């Protein structure tokens, strides 16, 4: 190597001058960089991230905690990148100052040192190019591995989609079975309600019939009391008539004796006249006394004429009373006959009513038997209905939880998509900025490598750092590969378990189909029974009310499920926290393995339980209705466990989309069913209207009959009261007549005694033949006017009436006897 002078001219060699690679000026044009290094993109990204951070710190930003933590990590990483960028800018400025100083020194360095430096820089470039190529190859291998993993993930997604579709089909079948059971139970409940209504109506009719019976009994008791009173009064009147007859007979005998005495007196008078005629000579002295007696006789004749007039008036009164008595007897007999006819008609009506009551009692007994049988069936059905309602509530709870979970996941997905788009934009902008920066840095680096030797030491240090970084990456990749292998093993185990569970589900589906057929047969039998009951009982009035009540209950249940949605959200947040802890802690994977082993042990226990349940189902097939609820409950638990496993193992977007589709289909299905229920409701309303009109017509007919019967009873009661009043008035009249007759008889007895005294006082000669004839005529007339024909007619009428009443009472007793037995 030639020694050159240390002058500035000696440093300059025209052959070695490279203006393209080395700068001859003292300026920093080649080593200057932009002060921001993509500051516009970074500033925009930072502004967006600061907005996101503020929204995360606030309460109005609704997002899942996973997304929040993810965005917070991104903000922290971007802040670190910004700090690194600033540090790199500062370091680049320091290096630019050093490079400018080195450029100045290089101008004063000889050419030999310049060549050596250029060779070193060229070797360093080659080494850097080789290392860069190796790093690119490693990056390509890593990208290939990432693609392979993405393909595996897509395959797993497809498997999960298939499993989700199968699960949706199973859920649809389960919903159909539950809906069929609900329909049958609703029909049974409607039938029970209708039976209860009919039973209440029958009880009401029974009460009305009992009230009518009580009214009839009261009327019969009143009639019997009136009969007893009438018979007592009749007996009293008969006794009085007998007494009057006896008194009349006694009076006749007395008059007969009096007639005999009068004849004796007449004979004595004749004898006295004979004696008077024979002794007229001797009685001349007594002529004055005879004249006095004649005057007394004239006075007595006047008195006798007055008595005769009084007797004639009394005879007229007696004839008037006899005619009135005959008229009253005829009217009373006619009224009695009318009352007897009415009583006979009432007895016939009562007999008809009793026969109708017997028929109704027989019908009631048959209906009670049927009602008891239906009650037993309804109790069994009610127990099953309670079990099914509990299971249905649990299923609705799970469905609402899923809906809430899906809605929350939809919101999370939207926020994630927005965040993912923002992050993609940030990534693109940062890549573009860093690409530009890398290009500028590479160009400047090449120039700087040509200019400085200190970078070799930095390159050596970076190689060491790079080797250390490669070792770390290799270790991390090995760990990731081990984790992937563990995950694949778990996936394989899960696939095997899913296959086993598919077999079990198919077995359960087969059992459910058999149960469905048996339920259909039971339903047909029950429908036949219901048709018979409906033909006898009649109406479906309460179906609309029951449906309205069921809709209200469903609305209340939907309102009650809102707090359960909040509980489900809290559970979801807790699960997300658990997932964060699992992602953050690598050491927890061993615990996951333990938990997986525990879950496998639990699954085995569940499988053993399922096998035990199937054996119990085989034994207890006869008790289908009791086992339906248990089987559905077990099936529901198995499905729930499967869903939970799928949720734990597959936390990805495809399953959420599928579940959203399922929910939409289920809502459409519910809308269809609601429309069908509405159409059925219209039909049932029409049928119930027709049947209600028939019931109203029958009820009106029955009420008309009842009102007629009540009117007849009221008329009978009124006529009975009228007859009682008439009988009382007749008894009063008869008592008044008897009193008058007794007064007349006493007056006549007094008159006869007076006549007897007068006859004893008077002489027989003083009475003439004409007077005697008149007295005999009076006595004959008096004998004729002793009421013998009227009393005889009274006796006959009273005896006839008594016989008629006795016959009627006997016939009524005969008619009433079987009724009392019933």
Swiss-Prot record:
Residues 129-164, 223-397, 510-537 form a coiled coil. Signal peptide: none annotated. Keywords: Coiled coil. InterPro entries: CCDC175 (IPR038834). This is Coiled-coil domain-containing protein 175. It comes from Mus musculus (Mouse).
């Amino acid at each position: 190597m030639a020694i050159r002078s240390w002058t500035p001219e000696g440093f300059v060699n025209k052959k070695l001058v490279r203006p393209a690679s080395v700068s001859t000026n003292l300026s920093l044009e080649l080593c200057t960089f932009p002060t921001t290094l993509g500051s516009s993109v970074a500033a925009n990204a930072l502004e967006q991230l600061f907005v996101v951070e503020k929204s995360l710190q606030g309460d109005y930003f609704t997002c899942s905690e996973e997304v929040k933590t993810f965005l917070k990590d991104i903000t922290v990483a971007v802040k670190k990148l910004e700090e690194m960028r600033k540090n790199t800018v500062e370091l680049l400025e320091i290096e630019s100052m050093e490079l400018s100083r080195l450029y100045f020194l290089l101008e004063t360095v000889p050419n030999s040192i310049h060549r050596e430096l250029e060779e070193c820089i060229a070797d360093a470039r080659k080494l850097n190019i080789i290392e860069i190529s190796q790093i690119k190859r490693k990056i390509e291998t890593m990208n290939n591995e990432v693609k392979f993993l993405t393909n595996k993930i897509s395959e797993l997604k497809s498997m999960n989609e298939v499993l989700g579709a199968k699960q949706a089909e199973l859920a649809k079948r389960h919903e159909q079975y539950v809906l069929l059971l609900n329909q049958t139970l609703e029909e049974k409940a409607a039938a029970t309600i209708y039976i209860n209504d009919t039973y209440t109506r029958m009880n009401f009719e029974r009460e009305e019939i009992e009230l009518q019976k009580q009214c009839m009994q009261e009327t019969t008791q009143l009639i019997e009391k009136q009969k007893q009173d009438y018979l007592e009064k009749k007996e009293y009147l008969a006794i009085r008539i007998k007494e009057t007859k006896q008194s009349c007979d006694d009076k006749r005998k007395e008059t007969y004796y009096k007639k005999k005495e009068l004849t004796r007196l007449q004979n004595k008078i004749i004898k006295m006249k004979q004696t008077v005629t024979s002794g007229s000579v001797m009685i001349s002295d007594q002529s004055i006394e005879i004249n006095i007696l004649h005057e007394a006789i004239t006075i007595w004749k006047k008195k006798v004429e007055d008595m005769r007039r009084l007797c004639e008036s009394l005879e007229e009164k007696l004839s008037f009373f006899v005619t009135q008595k005959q008229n009253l007897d005829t009217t009373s007999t006619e009224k009695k006959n009318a009352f007897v006819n009415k009583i006979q008609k009432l007895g016939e009506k009562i007999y008809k009513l009793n026969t109708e009551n017997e028929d109704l009692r027989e019908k009631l007994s048959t209906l009670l038997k049927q009602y008891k049988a239906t009650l037993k069936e309804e109790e069994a059905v009610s127990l099953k209905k309670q079990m099914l309602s509990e299971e249905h509530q649990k299923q609705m709870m799970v469905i609402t939880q899923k809906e809430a979970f899906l809605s929350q996941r939809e919101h999370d997905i939207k926020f994630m998509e927005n965040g993912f788009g923002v992050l993609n934009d940030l990534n693109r902008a940062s890549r573009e900025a860093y690409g530009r920066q890398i290009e500028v840095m590479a160009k400047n680096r090449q120039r700087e490598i040509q200019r400085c030797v200190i970078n070799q030491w930095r390159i050596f240090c970076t190689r060491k750092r790079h080797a250390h970084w490669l070792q770390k990456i290799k270790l991390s990749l090995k760990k990731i590969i081990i984790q992937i292998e563990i995950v694949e093993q778990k996936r394989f185990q899960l696939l095997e378990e899913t296959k086993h569970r598919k077999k079990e589900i198919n077995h359960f589906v087969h059992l459910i189909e058999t149960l469905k057929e048996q339920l259909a047969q039971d339903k047909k039998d029950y429908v036949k029974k219901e048709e018979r009951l409906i033909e006898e009982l009649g109406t479906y009035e309460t179906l609309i009310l029951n449906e309205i009540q069921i809709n209200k209950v469903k609305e209340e249940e939907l309102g009650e499920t809102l707090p359960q949605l909040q509980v489900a959200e809290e559970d979801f947040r807790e699960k997300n926290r658990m997932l964060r802890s699992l992602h953050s802690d690598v050491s927890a994977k061993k615990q996951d393995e333990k938990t997986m082993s525990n879950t496998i042990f639990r699954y085995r226990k569940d499988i053993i339980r399922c096998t035990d349940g199937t054996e119990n189902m085989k034994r207890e097939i006869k008790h289908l209705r009791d086992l339906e609820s248990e089987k559905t409950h077990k099936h529901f638990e198995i499905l729930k466990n499967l869903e939970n496993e799928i949720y734990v193992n597959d936390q990805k977007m495809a399953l959420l989309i599928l579940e959203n589709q399922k929910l939409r289909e289920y809502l459409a299905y519910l809308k269809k069913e609601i429309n069908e229920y509405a159409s059925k409701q219209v039909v049932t309303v029409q049928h119930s209207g027709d049947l209600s009109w028939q019931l109203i017509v029958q009820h009106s007919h029955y009420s008309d009959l009842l009102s007629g019967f009540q009117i007849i009873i009221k008329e009978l009661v009124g006529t009975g009261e009228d007859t009682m009043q008439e009988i009382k008035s007749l008894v009063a009249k008869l008592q008044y007549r008897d009193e008058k007759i007794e007064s007349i008889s006493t007056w006549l007895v007094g008159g006869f005694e007076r006549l007897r005294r007068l006859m004893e006082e008077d002489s027989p000669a003083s009475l003439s033949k004409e007077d005697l004839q008149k007295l005999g005529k009076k006595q004959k007339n008096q004998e004729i006017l002793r009421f013998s024909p009227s009393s005889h007619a009274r006796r006959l009428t009273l005896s006839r009436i008594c016989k008629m009443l006795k016959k009627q009472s006997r016939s009524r007793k005969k008619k009433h006897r079987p009724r009392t037995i019933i």
